[in-house]
Amino acid sequence: MLDATPKEIVERKALRINPAKTCQPVGAMYAALGIHNCLPHSHGSQGCCSYHRTVLSRHFKEPAMASTSSFTEGASVFGGGSNIKTAVKNIFSLYNPDIIAVHTTCLSETLGDDLPTYISQMEDAGSIPEGKLVIHTNTPSYVGSHVTGFANMVQGIVNYLSENTGAKNGKINVIPGFVGPADMREIKRLFEAMDIPYIMFPDTSGVLDGPTTGEYKMYPEGGTKIEDLKDTGNSDLTLSLGSYASDLGAKTLEKKCKVPFKTLRTPIGVSATDEFIMALSEATGKEVPASIEEERGQLIDLMIDAQQYLQGKKVALLGDPDEIIALSKFIIELGAIPKYVVTGTPGMKFQKEIDAMLAEAGIEGSKVKVEGDFFDVHQWIKNEGVDLLISNTYGKFIAREENIPFVRFGFPIMDRYGHYYNPKVGYKGAIRLVEEITNVILDKIERECTEEDFEVVR
Protein backbone atom coordinates (compact mmCIF):
# COMPACT_ATOMS: atom_id res chain seq x y z
CA MET A 1 0.00 0.00 0.00
CA LEU A 2 2.85 2.38 0.82
CA ASP A 3 5.44 0.71 -1.41
CA ALA A 4 5.79 3.94 -3.42
CA THR A 5 7.03 5.95 -0.43
CA PRO A 6 10.45 7.22 -1.55
CA LYS A 7 13.56 6.71 0.54
CA GLU A 8 14.93 10.10 -0.50
CA ILE A 9 13.72 12.81 1.89
CA VAL A 10 12.61 16.19 0.51
CA GLU A 11 11.88 19.03 2.92
CA ARG A 12 8.18 19.94 2.90
CA LYS A 13 6.89 23.27 4.22
CA ALA A 14 3.25 23.50 3.13
CA LEU A 15 2.15 19.90 2.75
CA ARG A 16 1.05 17.16 5.15
CA ILE A 17 0.90 13.54 4.01
CA ASN A 18 -1.06 11.26 6.33
CA PRO A 19 -1.20 13.74 9.25
CA ALA A 20 -0.82 12.60 12.85
CA LYS A 21 -3.82 14.59 14.09
CA THR A 22 -7.42 15.48 13.34
CA CYS A 23 -9.32 18.77 13.72
CA GLN A 24 -10.27 20.85 16.75
CA PRO A 25 -14.04 20.17 16.81
CA VAL A 26 -13.42 16.44 17.41
CA GLY A 27 -11.66 17.25 20.68
CA ALA A 28 -14.25 19.85 21.64
CA MET A 29 -17.09 17.39 21.03
CA TYR A 30 -15.30 14.75 23.11
CA ALA A 31 -14.82 17.16 26.02
CA ALA A 32 -18.48 18.23 25.86
CA LEU A 33 -19.58 14.59 26.07
CA GLY A 34 -17.82 14.58 29.45
CA ILE A 35 -20.53 16.86 30.89
CA HIS A 36 -23.57 15.11 32.37
CA ASN A 37 -26.77 15.53 30.31
CA CYS A 38 -24.95 17.65 27.73
CA LEU A 39 -25.57 17.72 23.99
CA PRO A 40 -22.53 18.90 22.01
CA HIS A 41 -23.49 21.24 19.18
CA SER A 42 -21.47 21.79 16.01
CA HIS A 43 -21.96 25.29 14.63
CA GLY A 44 -21.39 24.53 10.97
CA SER A 45 -22.56 22.21 8.22
CA GLN A 46 -24.09 18.77 8.67
CA GLY A 47 -21.08 17.14 7.05
CA CYS A 48 -18.69 18.50 9.68
CA CYS A 49 -20.79 17.21 12.55
CA SER A 50 -21.23 13.82 10.88
CA TYR A 51 -17.49 13.42 10.44
CA HIS A 52 -16.67 14.37 14.03
CA ARG A 53 -19.31 12.00 15.40
CA THR A 54 -18.07 9.24 13.10
CA VAL A 55 -14.46 9.53 14.27
CA LEU A 56 -15.51 9.27 17.91
CA SER A 57 -17.97 6.44 17.27
CA ARG A 58 -15.42 4.41 15.30
CA HIS A 59 -12.91 4.71 18.15
CA PHE A 60 -15.24 4.01 21.08
CA LYS A 61 -17.75 1.76 19.27
CA GLU A 62 -20.47 3.85 20.91
CA PRO A 63 -22.86 6.45 19.47
CA ALA A 64 -21.48 9.97 19.89
CA MET A 65 -24.55 12.18 20.17
CA ALA A 66 -24.35 15.73 18.83
CA SER A 67 -26.44 18.31 17.00
CA THR A 68 -25.61 20.79 14.24
CA SER A 69 -26.59 24.23 12.98
CA SER A 70 -26.94 22.68 9.50
CA PHE A 71 -25.38 25.48 7.46
CA THR A 72 -26.48 25.71 3.82
CA GLU A 73 -25.65 28.27 1.13
CA GLY A 74 -27.63 31.02 2.88
CA ALA A 75 -25.82 30.67 6.20
CA SER A 76 -22.52 30.48 4.34
CA VAL A 77 -23.17 33.97 2.98
CA PHE A 78 -25.18 35.72 5.69
CA GLY A 79 -23.89 33.94 8.80
CA GLY A 80 -25.32 31.25 11.03
CA GLY A 81 -27.10 33.36 13.65
CA SER A 82 -30.57 32.33 12.53
CA ASN A 83 -29.50 28.70 12.28
CA ILE A 84 -28.19 28.40 15.82
CA LYS A 85 -31.14 30.25 17.33
CA THR A 86 -33.55 27.87 15.64
CA ALA A 87 -31.36 24.90 16.55
CA VAL A 88 -31.26 25.75 20.26
CA LYS A 89 -35.07 26.07 20.40
CA ASN A 90 -35.48 22.71 18.68
CA ILE A 91 -32.86 20.97 20.80
CA PHE A 92 -34.42 21.97 24.13
CA SER A 93 -37.88 21.14 22.80
CA LEU A 94 -37.02 17.74 21.31
CA TYR A 95 -34.01 16.42 23.23
CA ASN A 96 -34.18 18.33 26.55
CA PRO A 97 -30.51 18.37 27.60
CA ASP A 98 -29.46 20.29 30.71
CA ILE A 99 -26.76 22.06 28.75
CA ILE A 100 -25.74 22.62 25.12
CA ALA A 101 -22.00 22.98 24.49
CA VAL A 102 -21.42 24.78 21.18
CA HIS A 103 -18.19 24.58 19.23
CA THR A 104 -17.40 26.31 15.95
CA THR A 105 -16.08 24.93 12.67
CA CYS A 106 -13.99 26.24 9.78
CA LEU A 107 -16.97 27.82 8.06
CA SER A 108 -18.47 29.64 11.03
CA GLU A 109 -15.01 30.84 12.10
CA THR A 110 -14.26 32.16 8.62
CA LEU A 111 -17.61 33.97 8.62
CA GLY A 112 -16.82 35.43 12.02
CA ASP A 113 -20.04 34.36 13.76
CA ASP A 114 -20.31 36.07 17.16
CA LEU A 115 -21.48 33.26 19.42
CA PRO A 116 -21.45 35.19 22.73
CA THR A 117 -23.82 37.72 21.18
CA TYR A 118 -26.07 35.00 19.78
CA ILE A 119 -26.24 33.29 23.18
CA SER A 120 -27.01 36.60 24.90
CA GLN A 121 -29.77 37.31 22.39
CA MET A 122 -31.27 33.85 22.98
CA GLU A 123 -31.26 34.46 26.73
CA ASP A 124 -32.99 37.83 26.28
CA ALA A 125 -35.58 36.27 23.95
CA GLY A 126 -36.34 33.45 26.39
CA SER A 127 -35.17 30.78 23.95
CA ILE A 128 -33.10 29.12 26.66
CA PRO A 129 -35.49 27.59 29.24
CA GLU A 130 -35.05 28.42 32.91
CA GLY A 131 -32.43 26.20 34.51
CA LYS A 132 -30.89 25.28 31.15
CA LEU A 133 -27.51 26.46 29.87
CA VAL A 134 -25.72 27.17 26.59
CA ILE A 135 -21.94 27.51 26.56
CA HIS A 136 -19.50 27.83 23.69
CA THR A 137 -15.89 27.75 22.58
CA ASN A 138 -14.09 28.66 19.37
CA THR A 139 -12.50 25.75 17.51
CA PRO A 140 -11.33 26.71 14.00
CA SER A 141 -10.26 23.49 12.29
CA TYR A 142 -7.41 25.13 10.40
CA VAL A 143 -5.51 25.86 13.63
CA GLY A 144 -4.18 23.35 16.15
CA SER A 145 -5.58 19.83 16.43
CA HIS A 146 -8.18 17.77 18.29
CA VAL A 147 -6.07 18.26 21.43
CA THR A 148 -6.35 22.04 21.02
CA GLY A 149 -10.11 21.68 20.61
CA PHE A 150 -10.35 19.66 23.82
CA ALA A 151 -8.37 22.34 25.67
CA ASN A 152 -10.56 25.11 24.27
CA MET A 153 -13.78 23.39 25.35
CA VAL A 154 -12.40 22.89 28.86
CA GLN A 155 -11.64 26.61 28.93
CA GLY A 156 -15.20 27.30 27.77
CA ILE A 157 -16.56 25.17 30.62
CA VAL A 158 -14.55 27.19 33.12
CA ASN A 159 -15.49 30.54 31.58
CA TYR A 160 -19.22 29.83 31.70
CA LEU A 161 -19.66 27.61 34.75
CA SER A 162 -16.90 27.79 37.39
CA GLU A 163 -17.79 29.95 40.40
CA ASN A 164 -15.91 31.03 43.51
CA THR A 165 -18.43 31.39 46.33
CA GLY A 166 -15.76 31.96 48.96
CA ALA A 167 -16.54 28.65 50.67
CA LYS A 168 -13.76 26.12 50.08
CA ASN A 169 -14.94 22.58 49.33
CA GLY A 170 -11.73 20.78 50.31
CA LYS A 171 -11.51 19.05 46.92
CA ILE A 172 -8.87 18.73 44.22
CA ASN A 173 -9.84 19.41 40.62
CA VAL A 174 -8.30 17.13 38.02
CA ILE A 175 -8.32 17.88 34.31
CA PRO A 176 -7.37 14.49 32.83
CA GLY A 177 -6.39 15.63 29.34
CA PHE A 178 -7.34 13.98 26.06
CA VAL A 179 -7.40 10.41 27.36
CA GLY A 180 -9.99 7.64 27.21
CA PRO A 181 -12.82 6.91 29.65
CA ALA A 182 -10.90 3.92 31.02
CA ASP A 183 -8.02 6.26 31.86
CA MET A 184 -10.41 8.62 33.60
CA ARG A 185 -11.80 5.72 35.63
CA GLU A 186 -8.27 4.71 36.62
CA ILE A 187 -7.35 8.24 37.71
CA LYS A 188 -10.52 8.41 39.81
CA ARG A 189 -9.74 5.00 41.30
CA LEU A 190 -6.35 6.27 42.47
CA PHE A 191 -7.98 9.32 44.08
CA GLU A 192 -10.46 7.07 45.84
CA ALA A 193 -7.74 4.62 46.93
CA MET A 194 -6.07 7.55 48.71
CA ASP A 195 -9.43 8.78 50.09
CA ILE A 196 -9.08 12.20 48.44
CA PRO A 197 -12.22 14.13 47.40
CA TYR A 198 -12.01 15.35 43.81
CA ILE A 199 -13.83 16.85 40.85
CA MET A 200 -12.78 15.48 37.47
CA PHE A 201 -13.76 17.54 34.48
CA PRO A 202 -14.54 16.64 31.82
CA ASP A 203 -15.29 12.99 32.55
CA THR A 204 -16.37 10.72 29.69
CA SER A 205 -16.40 7.54 31.79
CA GLY A 206 -19.92 6.16 31.86
CA VAL A 207 -20.68 8.04 28.64
CA LEU A 208 -18.53 6.40 25.96
CA ASP A 209 -17.81 3.13 27.76
CA GLY A 210 -21.20 2.36 29.24
CA PRO A 211 -22.87 -1.06 29.42
CA THR A 212 -25.61 -2.49 27.25
CA THR A 213 -28.71 -2.68 29.45
CA GLY A 214 -31.47 -3.11 26.89
CA GLU A 215 -32.67 0.43 27.58
CA TYR A 216 -31.61 3.36 25.40
CA LYS A 217 -30.57 6.57 27.13
CA MET A 218 -29.68 9.57 25.03
CA TYR A 219 -27.79 10.97 28.01
CA PRO A 220 -25.95 8.18 29.88
CA GLU A 221 -25.27 8.21 33.61
CA GLY A 222 -21.69 9.46 33.29
CA GLY A 223 -20.20 12.90 32.88
CA THR A 224 -19.38 15.68 35.34
CA LYS A 225 -22.52 17.22 36.79
CA ILE A 226 -23.17 20.93 36.33
CA GLU A 227 -23.19 21.61 40.08
CA ASP A 228 -19.73 20.03 40.32
CA LEU A 229 -18.47 22.11 37.40
CA LYS A 230 -19.66 25.25 39.18
CA ASP A 231 -17.98 24.04 42.38
CA THR A 232 -14.56 23.75 40.69
CA GLY A 233 -14.02 27.41 41.60
CA ASN A 234 -14.07 26.49 45.31
CA SER A 235 -11.45 23.73 45.17
CA ASP A 236 -8.06 23.84 46.87
CA LEU A 237 -5.99 22.86 43.83
CA THR A 238 -6.24 21.87 40.18
CA LEU A 239 -4.06 19.10 38.78
CA SER A 240 -3.47 19.60 35.07
CA LEU A 241 -2.53 16.25 33.55
CA GLY A 242 -0.73 17.11 30.33
CA SER A 243 0.12 20.69 29.48
CA TYR A 244 -1.28 20.68 25.93
CA ALA A 245 -4.79 19.47 26.75
CA SER A 246 -5.23 20.64 30.34
CA ASP A 247 -3.17 23.75 31.11
CA LEU A 248 -5.48 26.22 29.35
CA GLY A 249 -8.44 25.26 31.53
CA ALA A 250 -6.32 25.21 34.70
CA LYS A 251 -4.84 28.65 33.99
CA THR A 252 -8.27 30.08 33.20
CA LEU A 253 -9.66 28.69 36.45
CA GLU A 254 -6.76 30.17 38.41
CA LYS A 255 -7.30 33.57 36.83
CA LYS A 256 -11.09 33.51 37.29
CA CYS A 257 -11.47 31.81 40.69
CA LYS A 258 -7.98 31.98 42.23
CA VAL A 259 -7.62 28.18 42.34
CA PRO A 260 -3.89 27.34 42.09
CA PHE A 261 -2.83 24.63 39.67
CA LYS A 262 0.01 22.21 39.17
CA THR A 263 0.95 20.76 35.80
CA LEU A 264 1.97 17.12 35.66
CA ARG A 265 2.74 14.76 32.82
CA THR A 266 0.00 12.38 31.78
CA PRO A 267 0.59 9.56 34.31
CA ILE A 268 1.88 6.95 31.87
CA GLY A 269 4.83 4.86 33.03
CA VAL A 270 6.73 4.68 36.31
CA SER A 271 8.07 8.17 36.90
CA ALA A 272 5.01 10.04 35.58
CA THR A 273 2.70 7.97 37.78
CA ASP A 274 5.07 8.43 40.72
CA GLU A 275 4.84 12.20 40.23
CA PHE A 276 1.04 12.04 40.15
CA ILE A 277 0.76 9.90 43.29
CA MET A 278 3.27 12.04 45.19
CA ALA A 279 1.51 15.24 44.12
CA LEU A 280 -1.70 13.86 45.66
CA SER A 281 0.14 12.87 48.82
CA GLU A 282 1.90 16.22 49.19
CA ALA A 283 -1.24 18.26 48.49
CA THR A 284 -3.34 16.42 51.07
CA GLY A 285 -0.91 14.92 53.56
CA LYS A 286 -2.36 11.48 52.83
CA GLU A 287 -0.04 8.47 52.86
CA VAL A 288 0.23 6.27 49.79
CA PRO A 289 -1.73 3.09 50.56
CA ALA A 290 -0.11 -0.32 50.39
CA SER A 291 -2.40 -1.33 47.52
CA ILE A 292 -0.90 1.34 45.24
CA GLU A 293 2.64 0.46 46.33
CA GLU A 294 1.86 -3.16 45.44
CA GLU A 295 0.73 -2.15 41.94
CA ARG A 296 3.98 -0.24 41.45
CA GLY A 297 5.97 -3.27 42.57
CA GLN A 298 4.12 -5.49 40.11
CA LEU A 299 4.98 -3.08 37.29
CA ILE A 300 8.67 -3.05 38.23
CA ASP A 301 8.68 -6.85 38.42
CA LEU A 302 7.19 -7.12 34.92
CA MET A 303 9.69 -4.60 33.55
CA ILE A 304 12.54 -6.72 34.90
CA ASP A 305 11.01 -9.88 33.41
CA ALA A 306 10.68 -8.27 29.97
CA GLN A 307 13.98 -6.40 30.00
CA GLN A 308 15.90 -8.94 27.91
CA TYR A 309 13.55 -8.38 24.98
CA LEU A 310 13.28 -4.59 25.26
CA GLN A 311 16.80 -3.42 26.08
CA GLY A 312 18.23 -1.33 23.25
CA LYS A 313 15.22 -1.70 20.97
CA LYS A 314 14.60 1.29 18.70
CA VAL A 315 11.05 2.63 18.79
CA ALA A 316 9.09 5.04 16.57
CA LEU A 317 6.28 6.91 18.33
CA LEU A 318 3.52 9.09 16.85
CA GLY A 319 0.54 10.61 18.61
CA ASP A 320 -0.84 13.33 20.82
CA PRO A 321 1.84 15.39 22.57
CA ASP A 322 0.88 14.85 26.22
CA GLU A 323 0.68 11.09 25.81
CA ILE A 324 3.79 10.79 23.64
CA ILE A 325 5.90 12.86 26.06
CA ALA A 326 4.98 10.50 28.90
CA LEU A 327 5.24 7.37 26.75
CA SER A 328 8.70 8.36 25.47
CA LYS A 329 9.93 8.57 29.05
CA PHE A 330 8.41 5.16 29.77
CA ILE A 331 10.14 3.69 26.71
CA ILE A 332 13.44 4.93 28.15
CA GLU A 333 12.52 3.41 31.53
CA LEU A 334 12.04 0.08 29.74
CA GLY A 335 15.59 0.28 28.38
CA ALA A 336 14.51 1.00 24.82
CA ILE A 337 15.33 3.99 22.60
CA PRO A 338 12.78 6.51 21.30
CA LYS A 339 14.31 6.72 17.81
CA TYR A 340 11.61 8.76 16.06
CA VAL A 341 9.18 10.88 18.07
CA VAL A 342 6.46 12.82 16.24
CA THR A 343 3.29 14.73 17.07
CA GLY A 344 0.91 16.43 14.67
CA THR A 345 -0.14 19.03 17.24
CA PRO A 346 1.72 22.38 17.08
CA GLY A 347 3.76 23.67 20.03
CA MET A 348 7.54 23.68 20.36
CA LYS A 349 7.56 22.71 24.04
CA PHE A 350 7.08 19.13 22.79
CA GLN A 351 10.44 19.31 21.03
CA LYS A 352 12.11 20.85 24.09
CA GLU A 353 10.75 18.24 26.50
CA ILE A 354 11.69 15.27 24.32
CA ASP A 355 15.15 16.70 23.57
CA ALA A 356 15.80 17.23 27.29
CA MET A 357 14.57 13.72 28.06
CA LEU A 358 16.86 12.16 25.45
CA ALA A 359 19.84 14.21 26.60
CA GLU A 360 19.29 13.18 30.22
CA ALA A 361 19.26 9.52 29.14
CA GLY A 362 22.38 9.97 26.98
CA ILE A 363 20.52 8.98 23.82
CA GLU A 364 21.86 10.42 20.56
CA GLY A 365 20.73 10.21 16.94
CA SER A 366 16.98 10.35 17.55
CA LYS A 367 14.67 12.50 15.42
CA VAL A 368 11.93 14.62 16.97
CA LYS A 369 9.36 16.57 14.97
CA VAL A 370 6.45 18.85 15.85
CA GLU A 371 3.62 19.03 13.30
CA GLY A 372 5.07 15.96 11.62
CA ASP A 373 3.17 13.20 9.85
CA PHE A 374 3.25 9.48 9.10
CA PHE A 375 5.03 10.08 5.80
CA ASP A 376 7.98 11.64 7.69
CA VAL A 377 8.29 8.61 9.93
CA HIS A 378 7.96 6.15 7.06
CA GLN A 379 10.79 7.82 5.18
CA TRP A 380 12.98 7.85 8.28
CA ILE A 381 12.28 4.14 8.82
CA LYS A 382 13.20 3.37 5.20
CA ASN A 383 16.58 5.00 5.82
CA GLU A 384 17.15 3.50 9.26
CA GLY A 385 14.75 0.89 10.58
CA VAL A 386 13.21 0.45 14.01
CA ASP A 387 12.20 -2.54 16.10
CA LEU A 388 8.78 -1.27 17.14
CA LEU A 389 6.15 1.24 15.98
CA ILE A 390 3.64 2.78 18.41
CA SER A 391 0.83 4.95 17.03
CA ASN A 392 -2.87 5.11 16.32
CA THR A 393 -4.56 2.89 13.73
CA TYR A 394 -2.98 4.69 10.77
CA GLY A 395 0.45 3.34 11.65
CA LYS A 396 -0.65 -0.15 10.56
CA PHE A 397 0.15 0.64 6.93
CA ILE A 398 3.79 1.43 7.75
CA ALA A 399 4.03 -1.60 10.04
CA ARG A 400 2.72 -3.87 7.29
CA GLU A 401 4.95 -2.42 4.58
CA GLU A 402 8.14 -2.54 6.68
CA ASN A 403 7.34 -5.68 8.74
CA ILE A 404 7.58 -3.89 12.09
CA PRO A 405 5.91 -5.00 15.34
CA PHE A 406 3.05 -2.57 15.96
CA VAL A 407 1.28 -1.42 19.13
CA ARG A 408 -1.90 0.60 18.73
CA PHE A 409 -1.89 3.56 21.11
CA GLY A 410 -3.71 6.88 21.31
CA PHE A 411 -6.50 8.24 19.15
CA PRO A 412 -8.10 7.02 17.00
CA ILE A 413 -7.96 3.23 17.16
CA MET A 414 -10.67 2.13 14.77
CA ASP A 415 -9.69 -1.42 13.80
CA ARG A 416 -9.58 -3.15 17.19
CA TYR A 417 -12.07 -3.78 19.99
CA GLY A 418 -11.92 -3.48 23.76
CA HIS A 419 -9.06 -0.98 24.03
CA TYR A 420 -11.49 1.64 25.37
CA TYR A 421 -12.00 -0.51 28.49
CA ASN A 422 -8.27 -0.82 29.26
CA PRO A 423 -6.42 2.12 30.84
CA LYS A 424 -2.93 3.14 29.83
CA VAL A 425 -2.42 5.49 32.79
CA GLY A 426 -1.30 4.56 36.27
CA TYR A 427 0.69 1.51 37.24
CA LYS A 428 -2.10 -0.78 36.04
CA GLY A 429 -2.10 0.91 32.64
CA ALA A 430 1.69 0.65 32.40
CA ILE A 431 1.50 -3.08 33.12
CA ARG A 432 -0.86 -3.43 30.18
CA LEU A 433 1.51 -1.42 27.95
CA VAL A 434 4.54 -3.55 28.87
CA GLU A 435 2.51 -6.66 28.08
CA GLU A 436 1.46 -5.34 24.66
CA ILE A 437 4.91 -4.05 23.72
CA THR A 438 6.77 -7.19 24.77
CA ASN A 439 4.31 -9.59 23.20
CA VAL A 440 4.28 -7.98 19.74
CA ILE A 441 8.08 -8.18 19.73
CA LEU A 442 7.92 -11.85 20.77
CA ASP A 443 5.30 -12.52 18.09
CA LYS A 444 7.71 -11.30 15.41
CA ILE A 445 10.59 -13.31 16.86
CA GLU A 446 8.55 -16.50 16.84
CA ARG A 447 7.05 -15.80 13.42
CA GLU A 448 10.47 -15.52 11.82
CA CYS A 449 12.76 -17.76 13.89
CA THR A 450 14.06 -21.13 12.79
CA GLU A 451 12.39 -24.31 13.97
CA GLU A 452 15.27 -24.92 16.40
CA ASP A 453 14.65 -21.56 18.09
CA PHE A 454 10.86 -21.91 18.32
CA GLU A 455 10.79 -22.24 22.11
CA VAL A 456 7.94 -23.20 24.43
CA VAL A 457 9.29 -20.93 27.17
CA ARG A 458 10.48 -17.38 26.70
Swiss-Prot record:
GO terms for cellular component: molybdenum-iron nitrogenase complex. Binds 1 [8Fe-7S] cluster per heterodimer. Its EC number is 1.18.6.1. [8Fe-7S] cluster binds at residues 23, 48, 106, 141. CDD domains: Nitrogenase_MoFe_beta (cd01974). GO terms for molecular function: ATP binding; iron-sulfur cluster binding; metal ion binding; nitrogenase activity. PROSITE patterns: NITROGENASE_1_1, NITROGENASE_1_2. Keywords: ATP-binding, Iron, Iron-sulfur, Metal-binding, Nitrogen fixation, Nucleotide-binding, Oxidoreductase. Its cofactor is [8Fe-7S] cluster. Disulfide bonds: none annotated. It catalyses: N2 + 8 reduced [2Fe-2S]-[ferredoxin] + 16 ATP + 16 H2O = H2 + 8 oxidized [2Fe-2S]-[ferredoxin] + 2 NH4(+) + 16 ADP + 16 phosphate + 6 H(+). InterPro entries: ChlB/BchB/BchZ (IPR050152), Nase/OxRdtase_comp1 (IPR000510), Nase_comp1_CS (IPR000318), Nase_Mo-Fe_CF_bsu (IPR005976). GO terms for biological process: nitrogen fixation. This molybdenum-iron protein is part of the nitrogenase complex that catalyzes the key enzymatic reactions in nitrogen fixation. Tetramer of two alpha and two beta chains. Forms complex with the iron protein (nitrogenase component 2). Belongs to the NifD/NifK/NifE/NifN family. This is Nitrogenase molybdenum-iron protein beta chain. It comes from Clostridium pasteurianum. The gene is nifK.
